[in-house]
Amino acid sequence: MHPGGAIGGELIFSRLGDIVTRWPWVVIGCWTLLALMLPMTVPSLTELTQRHPVVILPVDAPSSVAAKKISQAFHEVDSENVLIVLLTDDKGLGPADETVYRTLVDRLRNDTKDVVVLQDFLSTPPLHELLVSKDGKAWILPIVLAGELGTSASYQAYAGVAGIVKQTLESTAGSSLKANLTGPASTVADLTDAGARDRTSIELVIAVLLLTILMIIYRNPITMLLPLITIGASLMTAQAVVSGVSVLAGLAVSNQMIVLLSAMIAGAGTDYAVFLISRYHDYIRMGSGSAQDAGCAVRQALISLGKVIAASAATVGITFLGMSFTKIRVFSTVGPALAIGIAVAFLAAVTLMPALLVLAGTRGWVAPRRDRAGAFWRRTGVRIVRRPVAYLSASMVILIVLALCASLVRFNYDDRKQIPASDESSVGYAALESHFPVGQAIPEYLLIQSPHDLRTPRALADMAELAQRVSQIPGIALVRGVTRPTGKPLEETSATYQAGMVGKQLGSASHLIGESTGDLNRLASGAGLLADKLGDVRIQVGQAVAGISGLLDNLAFAQKMFGDSKTLGEIDTAGKLVSSMRALGNMFGINFSTTMNDINWVGAVVIALDSSVLCDTNPICADARAQFHKLLTASEDGTLDNIAHLWKQLGSTQSSQTIGATVSGLEKTLTAVNTSLRSLGLDNPNVMRSKMIGLQNGVNDLASAGRRIADGVAVLVDQTRTMGTSLARASAFLMEMGQDASQPSMAGFNVPPQLLNTEDFKKLVQAFISPDGHSVRYFIQTDLNPFSSAAMDQVNTILNVATGAQPNTTLSDASIYLSGYTVTLRDTRDYYDRDLQLIVIVTMIVVLLILMALLRSIVAPIYLVGSVIVSYLSALGLCVLVFQVLLRQQLHWSVPGLAFVVLVAVGADYNMLLASRLRDESSHGLRASVIRTVRSTGGVITAAGLIFAASMFGLLLSSIATVVQAGFVLGSGILLDTFIVRTITVPAVAALLRRASWWPARPWGNNA
């Protein structure tokens, strides 16, 4: 030992060696009690895998937050424990199949213990298009199961639903319907079964491999069994401690973690045991102890290697503990468990293993065999020292070529590929993809949350624009929602569709006007004729009023002067009066009869004008229609008939009539007229005169109005014809716009307010809008593989496009969320990238600092850590060649991070053993120290490497792809580190650097 040895560490292990060698049975008894009694006080790890399952992402992950928001807004269960029942009929789904479907839905709804939510298209018709395949041969029945995903409650619920599905299909006749179970719940159930099924076989194979390798190395059954006893006690104790931590602190447990814990304890524990046995044999050979005094050799070996084993365990354990600060729960839960396992393995290596060596050594059961490999390793050391550049170059070429292959790595985030293709969930996924696009079965959910009610036309229009923009992203197949329930915008809500409908209506109006051209011409002609006749009436009434006024004056005077008994003929001066009365009556009787006949057709005109919307909007036409109504009223109430009778009486006046009789007859007629036209004042001569004047004025106004009517009707007809032409042009334009601008990018969006109250809209609301109206979700289906990196990149694009559509809209203050399995994978990738950086930094710092503390040097730890990194990259490159290039399997995303921690930590073990021995042998000269170190550690490191690699290769028997890949990369990495890096590369570098390796400390001895 050199003077600069770790005095404190040696003192600790010296005292520990004294205790172990003095009371070995006590130490063994304590470990036996721990290994047997401790597991009885805590649940098994298998049980805890269901009580405390591993959740990959933290609760504040964006995808987790989005899922929580959706479940709260729509009052749904926030659970990833989803089972998909796929019902298929290769002959096509028929009525008999639908009967089975209804029966199954009813039975599942009655199973309230296992089923939390059931989504069927019977109770939710808007989901029909999502749940039925386009080929008409498959139905999807999504079910949310009771319990959290991965728990025993979830597993029991899965088994219960699977039983109902199987029983329903078997008990229903007349249907060829088949069922497959898939989805996250089915995948986790298969993983659980596979983990439980694989664990026993893996542990058995590891034990057999260890026995075989130990038998080859030691050729002694007792020596071979000692490490296995130590590993067994360590494993039982470590599992119990991890279980206790899980119960007390809620540490999540998975089957993969249990397998890795077993492998790590087996590998590390065996390494520590091999290191200790090897050094024990060295001291036995050097005569430091005999078979009768094995305790001394054990104590010396423990003092010599205790600090190395402690540094190695600290390196691995602290590195694993550093993983607890990662975000991904796979790392943050596996790390502490593996750290506990390493700590227990270390304690067993420095207490139980020495105690067993003391008992076996004193009986001569573990005496060293003749060192047959020593000469080989010495020759290897000599060659390396003589030609360090050549050996270093050759080893680096191999390592660098393999490391370059690591740049080709492509990660797989599809957990479906972890399990065998023959498992239930894998078969179900394959059947699902044959009938449905993968994106339809695994959609994404875009959530819009606003402080305002989104059930308004403007908000719906803004959301339609947002959804339209998202749908135009390359790789997006469909976007379904309240504004586009079929994946395309509703035709009725597009502005161009509505314009087209208006165009059709205008076209109909134009056509109607065109067909009514003859009626319009007759209307114009009739209005002109009416105006002409009313002009004639005005002239005649003017003459009549003048004549009647004079006549009334003369008759009144004659009656006064001659009395009522005189005849008109007896009055000579009245001759002219009689002639005038006859002429006046005849003239007006004939002309008024003609006018009456001409007025008869006005009724038809009025009926036509009353039904005309255009006349309602035209003031001229409306005024003319009112005048026509007055004429019809006068005709219908007898006013015009009484006037005609007046003319007839005047025309039949005889000279033999007495004045009284004549006046009396005229008065009777006028009284009748007065009854109808009391407003004319014909009930007395004075008023009659004024009324006749008023009549004359009224007729004048009527004639003038008639002319205005005729002129107005002519203008109206011309305007109507012009309007018909304009309507035709407008109709053609709008209909052309409705056809040519029907694409979503040109169609616009308009929601009539009355649409919001329709039954169809209310059904859409239930599926896409939250009850309070403040949250709206859209279903997004992608053309990409939802498990691919391209789909994960698309998630960011969707969010960027959606948020980019918010400014200057009613959604400006809304929050946008995206949920779904692809979003979860995106978060997993993002967290993994950050966690991997953390793991690399923490691991490098921990390994470097511990090596510096152990070797009291800066240079040697730097190239030792560099060699570990190269070894890791080479192992990863070899894994890429085997799985990705040869087997066409992408590496699971969790493998590189876990492999880095294990390989760097294990490589540090061998580095510490090698470097510490170099340091110890430096008193013999640097060149000689390299040769002596290679000779003394070559066999030990090789044996330890083979044992650890065998433990890792035992994982290849797993049916879980991730475990297989991890086992291969770890096993191959350890072999590369054992046979190339520790055997050739590091000794060659040490030989080249010589004294500089220990800078700034000074080596002991000469530079021989």
Swiss-Prot record:
InterPro entries: MMPL_dom, MmpL_fam, Mycobact_MmpL. It holds the Pfam family MMPL. GO terms for cellular component: plasma membrane. Gene3D superfamilies: Multidrug efflux transporter AcrB transmembrane domain. Its main location: membrane. The chain crosses the membrane at residues 23-43, 202-222, 225-245, 257-277, 301-321, 340-360, 389-409, 835-855, 862-882, 895-915, 940-960, 961-981. Keywords: Cell membrane, Membrane, Transmembrane, Transmembrane helix, Transport. It is found in: Cell membrane. It is a multi-pass membrane protein. It comes from the Bacteria. Belongs to the resistance-nodulation-cell division (RND) (TC 2.A.6) family. MmpL subfamily. This is Probable transport protein MmpL10. It comes from Mycobacterium leprae (strain TN).
